[in-house]
């Protein structure tokens, strides 16, 4: 990597420019404990010469102290960063690494295999385009393989690469490879995973990771890095699916008022008719500002159109009441607006979730108080069986009915990851205690929860005022 280091040091601007126009692919590695996830990533980084000299020197020292590969460099130590990870030889936290090839940029999420760290794996999978599921060639499909495959499918990852690892320990047997591939194919069909790819690898020795291996002449496919380089994950932005969660209102002077945020989906042009939700107010896009001095006199900062995931400022032709948490969409393609949602919830806190308790539900830029009205069923992610429960514990995944104190504009998660997902925040500790995906939004009148207006006493109003003035972090609403 010394030559690469010198190149960066001599021409940092050129190095950045070389990579800025490459498309980005995010992938995660998952599988059972000790299947070699961290070793695979370490090998990929090492063989693609993306390890800096100081990182390599540190890893060599740690390898002598904690390594399990004798005199050889323990590739897993290039990724496992926590002291407890190195000492125990396992992955606990989600480790992110960046590297690039001639064709593409990559962000890797190395996720833990242990069941007690399921919430960490969900975090890593939430932004991934591709999942690499490792299977030990000696053990085949295990319970944790089934669990991770379920989570990968639940989070909408459409491409799954099955890396059958430690093939060197079974003499690169084609029979073993075919047996495991067939078994996982049946599992993928059961879950509804559409795009699966199978590669025989040895992460420790580097076979079929970056370069083709001579020890598997019967395998005609691409090595792992070649497959990641050539995989098509692009999706053309659909103009009609425009979603723009408003992050904040920008008013730098009396002559300008714009609405800032990152486009979550679709494409917008100046002159488009838009609707602000949940208020339902309509107007047209006057200008789209994407850089530089934010004034309507500075035409160089304007663009005729913008698309996901660009961060822009939008101005409107009419004075419309828009605030943080609102969503701007095309008038011809409105998402459903409701306060009653069907969700899949992953509970991430040691304190159990009990229906009826109020939490803050953070979806995109909006934060709305809400609660779980009913748990439909909990999924046993090892057997895929549904269980009836009254509350959720750490790492539980369940189908629930969630009710909010006010309606929001929402999409199903399978349609839009950003506007169809949310986190659950404890209102007292401010801890993130859960994460979820919107499965359905109630449209039928009888399904929408009616939150009737309540008549408050003078004492209740006084208490409300006291809480708002002295505990603003509670974000208590005005009554």
Curated annotation (Swiss-Prot):
MF terms (GO), sorted A to Z: ATP binding; GTP binding; GTPase activity; sulfate adenylyltransferase (ATP) activity
Membrane-spanning residues: none
Domain tr-type G: 22-238
Region G2, residue ranges: 89-93
Residue segments, region G1: 31-38
Keywords for the protein's UniProt record, in alphabetical order: ATP-binding, GTP-binding, Nucleotide-binding, Nucleotidyltransferase, Transferase
Region (G4): 165-168
Gene3D superfamilies linked: P-loop containing nucleotide triphosphate hydrolases, Translation factors
Annotated stretches, region: G5: 202-204
Pathway of action: Sulfur metabolism; hydrogen sulfide biosynthesis; sulfite from sulfate: step 1/3
First and last residue of the signal peptide: none
Reaction(s) catalysed (UniProt annotation): sulfate + ATP + H(+) = adenosine 5'-phosphosulfate + diphosphate
Region (G3): 110-113
Coiled-coil segments on the chain, per record: none
EC assignment: 2.7.7.4
Binding-site residues for GTP, renumbered to this chain: 31-38, 110-114, 165-168
PROSITE patterns: G_TR_1, G_TR_2
Database matches in CDD domains: CysN_ATPS (cd04166), CysN_NodQ_II (cd03695), CysN_NoDQ_III (cd04095)
Subunit organization: Heterodimer composed of CysD, the smaller subunit, and CysN.
HAMAP family for this protein: Sulf_adenylyltr_sub1 (MF_00062)
Homology family: Belongs to the TRAFAC class translation factor GTPase superfamily. Classic translation factor GTPase family. CysN/NodQ subfamily.
Function: With CysD forms the ATP sulfurylase (ATPS) that catalyzes the adenylation of sulfate producing adenosine 5'-phosphosulfate (APS) and diphosphate, the first enzymatic step in sulfur assimilation pathway. APS synthesis involves the formation of a high-energy phosphoric-sulfuric acid anhydride bond driven by GTP hydrolysis by CysN coupled to ATP hydrolysis by CysD.
Protein name: Sulfate adenylyltransferase subunit 1
